[in-house]
């Protein structure tokens, strides 16, 4: 299972240039493609150039046209758009990433690696970020981790922001089972607004984004957050 990665939204990039990149990616015939828009992170050279107005960030309309073209071309080539940034041939979804999106427990090995467990309490932990410190603690036969016990509100927010990224969406029965009726009612009150706007849909017991909703997914997810 070979996966390619594609980044788009570079300064001055045109839709025609992205089209060429997508067509080249398709020609490689890999089983999987991850595609991400360029982000300007504070402290990086790109961010500094942006602040100095030496480069220009892709405007929202152009970005949406690029993303729409990406979806159209990848699905036309037989790839399943199973997560906001991921496409796969049938049967080749990323099992690794899917575990994060569906709350499967995992162990992280290495500096700054994160782990997640559900019993005896739901906890997220992470190793020391400094590689030298991490190696030293392992050599001494001990571990040094920070951790966070996740309450229901945090778990709910995490589930919303991960599950809604996928084509499967949120399993409504899981919300009732894991969080109770009050959380479920809160979810559905917000969902009804977006369903009426054709931004979300309920199908086979799952609440998911529509194609229209994908384009404003961050805004929709923020509407569901418990603060």
List each model region and its residues:
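C-terminal scaffold of the Radical SAM
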Residues: 1-181
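Residues at alpha-helix caps and immediate loop-helix transition turns in enzyme cores, especially N-
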Residues: 17-18, 186, 220
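Solvent-exposed, charged/polar functional surfaces in cytosolic regulatory/catalytic domains
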Residues: 73, 193, 197, 223
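Short amphipathic alpha-helical interaction segments
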Residues: 180-195
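A short, conserved structural fragment
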Residues: 195-205
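Minor-groove-contacting beta-hairpin "wing" of winged helix-turn-helix DNA-binding domains
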Residues: 206-210
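Short, amphipathic alpha-helical interaction segments positioned at domain boundaries
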Residues: 212-227
């Amino acid at each position: 299972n070979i996966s390619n990665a594609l980044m788009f939204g570079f300064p001055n990039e045109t839709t025609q240039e992205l089209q060429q990149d997508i067509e080249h990616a398709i020609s490689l015939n890999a089983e999987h493609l991850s595609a991400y828009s360029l982000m300007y992170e504070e402290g990086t050279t790109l961010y500094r150039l942006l602040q100095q107005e030496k480069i220009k960030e892709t405007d929202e309309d152009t970005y949406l046209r690029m993303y729409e073209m990406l979806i159209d071309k990848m699905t036309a080539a037989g790839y399943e758009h199973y997560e906001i940034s991921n496409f796969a041939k049938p049967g080749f979804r990323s099992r690794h990433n899917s575990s994060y999106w569906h709350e499967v427990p995992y162990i992280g090995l290495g500096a700054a690696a994160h782990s997640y467990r559900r019993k005896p309490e739901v906890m997220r932990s992470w190793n020391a970020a400094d590689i030298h410190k991490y190696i030293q603690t392992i050599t001494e036969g001990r571990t040094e981790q920070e951790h966070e016990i996740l309450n229901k509100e945090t778990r709910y927010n995490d589930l919303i922001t991960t599950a809604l990224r996928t084509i499967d969406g949120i399993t409504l029965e899981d919300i009732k089972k894991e969080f109770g009726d009050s959380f479920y009612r809160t979810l559905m009150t917000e969902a009804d607004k977006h369903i009426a706007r054709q931004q979300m849909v309920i199908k086979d017991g799952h609440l998911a984004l529509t194609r229209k909703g994908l384009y404003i997914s961050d805004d929709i997810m923020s509407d569901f957050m418990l603060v």
